[in-house]
Amino acid sequence: MQKIWLFSIITIFLITELQCYPNSAEERLLSYIFDGYNSLIRPVLNASSPPIEVFFSLAFVLLINVDEKNQIMQTNVWPTMKWNDYQMQWDPREFDGIKTIRVPPDKVWLPDIVLFNNADGNYLVSFYSNVVVEHTGDMLWVPPAVYKSSCLIDVEFFPFDEQVCSLTFGSWTFRKDELQLSYLSGKRHVELNDYLPSGVWDLIDAPGLLIDERSKISYQIKIRRKALFYTVILIMPTVLMAFLSMMVFYLPAESSEKITLAISILLALVVFLLVVSKILPPTSSTIPLMAKYLLMTFIMNMITIMVSVIIINVYFRGPATHIMPNWVKTVFLKFLPVLFVMRRPESTEKELAKMKREKRERRSMKSALKTFFKRNDAKISEQPKQTSRKDGSSSEEKLSSDAKKAIEAIEYITTHLTHDNAFKRQREEWKFVSVVIDRLLLYLFFAVTTGGTVGILLSAPNVFEQVNQTSVIERLKQQAAEEMLNS
């Protein structure tokens, strides 16, 4: 019985010992390299050793968003860091030829590389992936990260703008004599092997630059906005409204819709100004290109409303309140109609001719009546003297009195008709002056609007320059490959 108990105890002891002993090469390797390893110590032999060199590269995966209002760029990137830890070396022949292992990042020393121009307080990476360890002591760490970085947005040429946003990485605690950065495999540009093109921005270039004596590395992300969306949604309606406001001068002055149309366009422009103000940052350094054009259109529309009021006032003028100056007749009734190839309505011309003809006829009739009555007076004075002096004098006075009354009546009617026709003629002249002013302002506003549209919208440097994103990505990939070969 005692022998059985002794055999059982020995068997249990042997099984326990076998389970505690590493039964694979990888387990033995991990026990070997972490025996006495301290992840808090910078992997250098002594304090006087040269600074540890961390090789850094950045893989650009996705441009998530550019928030112009808050001046923030959100990106999905893969920062790649490589350094050498002399404590993590082993001979692969002693561990079944194992040359590479993967360990959790909290088990080894990591360089505290963070994004300096962070905008949301999240300086570290979002996911701590495993560290790849080579038997030579080379450590490779590629943690994926989603960064929100601050970016100074230049809205001068919006929506045809280019932006240059930086991603600046560096050690948060180590001095430049303790840690230095270098390009990984000579890659001076971001890697674009896994880049997904954005639907809003085109990537133009993304060079890297070592700064502050190699203690930091800064990548300049140069992007250009795809303006098609804003061209269709914002620019084209604004341009159409700018030219539509000129149609106010094509409406007749007696139309009640002249001012209504101008005010409706003005309200639409106010709405577009509010839309632009919500998109762009409230900066006072520059005025956006689109805001300049909207402001120009807004001012032109305000002038249109004021001038339309003046035109309507001119249209309803008459000789009772306004006497047309000679210079107005010369400019607006003689010179400008010829310049603009304008003719007065035929009815007006016929009416003027009829008025002149009637005036001549009235003058002729008046002259004939005067001659007729003078002859009658002469005949009466030559009658025989037998007629009593009293009767002759009475008859002559009666005839002369009737003639004078008839002449006065004719003169009154003639004067009234003349004044009435003159009143109508002057009213028609004022109406025609308003039509000429409308035509003058139509041409003038068309020239100013066209010139302003071309001058403002075409002042952007990249209006007609199209970006082939596929070609740009291939060019940058090829450039990165050449940098690797030359390193």
Curated annotation (Swiss-Prot):
PROSITE patterns, per the entry: NEUROTR_ION_CHANNEL (PS00236)
Transmembrane segments: 232-252, 259-279, 294-314, 440-460
Extracellular side: 21-231
Cellular compartment(s): Postsynaptic cell membrane; Cell membrane
Cytoplasmic side: 315-439
Alphabetical list of CDD domains matching this protein: LGIC_ECD_nAChR_proto_beta-like, LGIC_TM_nAChR
Secretion signal, residue range per the UniProt entry: 1-20
A GO cellular-component term linked to this record: plasma membrane
Glycosylation: residue positions: N46
Keywords: Cell membrane, Disulfide bond, Glycoprotein, Ion channel, Ion transport, Ligand-gated ion channel, Membrane, Postsynaptic cell membrane, Receptor, Signal, Synapse, Transmembrane, Transmembrane helix, Transport
Chain spans, region Disordered: 380-400
Membrane topology: Multi-pass membrane protein
Function: Non-alpha subunit of nicotinic acetylcholine receptor (nAChR). Probably acts in cholinergic motoneurons to regulate presynaptic neurotransmitter release, thereby ensuring normal level of excitation of cholinergic motoneurons during locomotion.
PANTHER family: NEUROTRANSMITTER GATED ION CHANNEL (PTHR18945)
Quaternary structure and partners: Component of nicotinic acetylcholine receptor. In cholinergic motoneurons, composed of 2 non-alpha subunits acr-2 and acr-3, and 3 alpha subunits unc-38, unc-63 and acr-12.
Protein name in UniProt: Acetylcholine receptor subunit beta-type acr-3
Species, as recorded: Caenorhabditis elegans
Gene assigned in the entry: acr-3
